[in-house]
Amino acid sequence: MQLSWKDIPTVAPANDMLDIVLNRTQRKTPTVIRPGFKITRIRAFYMRKVKFTAEGFEEKFDDILKGFPNINDVHPFHRDLMDTLYEKNHYKISLAAVSRAKTLVEQVSRDYTRLLKFGQSLFQCKQLKRAALGRMATIVKKLKDPLVYLEQVRQHLGRLPSIDPNTRTLLICGYPNVGKSSFLRCITKSDVEVQPYAFTTKSLYVGHFDYKYLRFQAIDTPGILDRPTEEMNNIEMQSIYAIAHLRSCVMYFMDLSEQCGFSVEAQVKLFHSIKPLFANKSVMVVINKTDIIRPEDLDEERAKLLQTVTELPGVEIMSASCQLEDNVMNVRNKACEKLLASRIENKLKSQARITNVLNKIHVAKPQARDDVERTPYIPEEFKKLKKYDPEDPERRLLARDIEAENGGAGVFNINLKDKYILDDDEWKNDIMPEIMDGKNVYDFLDPDIAAKLQALEEEEERLEKEGFYDSDEDESYGGFDQEEIDEIREKADWIRNKQKKMIAEARNKKSLRNKAMMPRSKLVKSFGDMEKHMATLGHDMSSLQDKHRAAAEKSRYVETGADVVFGQNDSMASGSNGGKLRQSDRLLDGVADGSMRSKADRMAKLQRRQRNRDARQGEADRHATASLPKHLFSGKRGIGKSDFR
């Protein structure tokens, strides 16, 4: 349930709303259209204008209708409060006018869009667009007064305090200037204006405080005058509606000193006149300003008037002084206790809730099977035990007694392992590891582990004596002879080597996945590799070896006499080296030494710098790029986009 309305969007005046929506249409829709364009494009241009403007008005109206609360859906307290402050009928008529304007704008947009579909020229479409926007503007201008009223309501709603009608509430009421605001300032941290004249509080003020870890709200209401409800103003009606609708403890304040300007008789009369509003509520009468006069100091006539209030059932009277802060917190605590008790009582009276809870509860009670009385059994040994007495010198010493005898806590540490029950008392203080070899030691503990180990050892000795583990020499290899075993081992070695090669080949392929790979047809393959591969497969390569040798002898070069002569001439011509001339580096042929070479490199680098800055492809690149690209620096706004201007 919504308790405050501080997030309602601002309601713009009619003229401002027109400027906002029309400027938005001008900024966010295309602006260029020419008579030479296709008629379908012209129609779409102006239809977009009309629809976009209508959507802008509809969004504004939707924000208003959704932001303001529906007066029929809120709590009765808020409904009556809004009726008092803003006049319910005026509020409904204003929102209805906005809703009607939204419907009319939608209808205008729909009608003129239908007409624009049949426009014959640019001028005709433009005039239809002007007519549509003009009618929308006329509709919005008629909302001038409702929009101004709704903006004032929005501002006032945002300043209203957040009052929860269902939480624990103390409601402070009474005549003006009897000390209601002073009491609220004393029990809460709210900064309420306090003045020595009447009608200082003109609206509801809320303060919060904690009592017994529960959150309470205290509401200070404007002063009420003793007159008919029809004659009360809006300020007084706020108090009446708060008393009528809020589930609270009503604290009726009285000023017996009559400094508030109203007599005790008038204050008692007001209490009796608003008494019907106290139905189903806890009521407390608070006598304020006891620093001036106390109830005991009243004369007999006024004491009888006050007694007519206290004699009513369920009404409790207390006194306090907000000026001296005397008994203020006691009054507050008493009111809180009274409110909590009444809330619990109301919950218990609601039969529906109790019925729902009782349907879920079943109390199971055991039924007696016979009439035999079965008393609890206590062994005789326990009955004979002597009762522990700390003053008895022969008592059994407890651990704390031993600790006290040896210096007390912090000096003497009690041995917690002293009561362990083990086979050997020397084992009590042994260190027991929790983790050993990465395993939990307690998972392998067994009380009978020694007996089980001894039984296993005896069984092993018996099996060895019986020859259970002895085996014949023929059966040592599973019935295979030595030759078969050697053959199996050779095959196993071959399989292992083959697996290693396959793994190595797979790794090589994986490493070359993103690198350049030599084609299979270009790989150099020797006859020796093929011979080894075929031998591993079990093929006889003797015939292929003979053919390979014969082919190699035929291809071998045989020197003749002419070859010898040419060879000698070549060796003489090449000098003492007798080999081929090395090819020189053409980049360094024209450079004398290292210093000249570094200077040449530096000059070449300087020449490349400007070319790189201009992004030239080389020395011959003389292309002149456009300094002002025409497609970026010419033209106007197109449909749906704009240029760089």
From Swiss-Prot:
The keyword Zinc-finger does not apply. It is found in: Nucleus, Nucleolus. GO terms for biological process: assembly of large subunit precursor of preribosome; ribosomal subunit export from nucleus; rRNA processing. Residues 168-340 form the OBG-type G domain. GO terms for cellular component: cytoplasm; nucleolus; preribosome, large subunit precursor. One of its GO terms (molecular function) is GTP binding. Keywords: GTP-binding, Nucleotide-binding, Nucleus, Ribosome biogenesis. GTP binds at residues 174-181, 220-224, 288-291. Residues 612-624 have a biased composition (Basic and acidic residues). Signal peptide: none annotated. Residues 567-645 are annotated as: Disordered. The keyword Nucleotide-binding applies. Its main location: nucleus. Belongs to the TRAFAC class OBG-HflX-like GTPase superfamily. OBG GTPase family. NOG subfamily. Involved in the biogenesis of the 60S ribosomal subunit. This is Nucleolar GTP-binding protein 1.
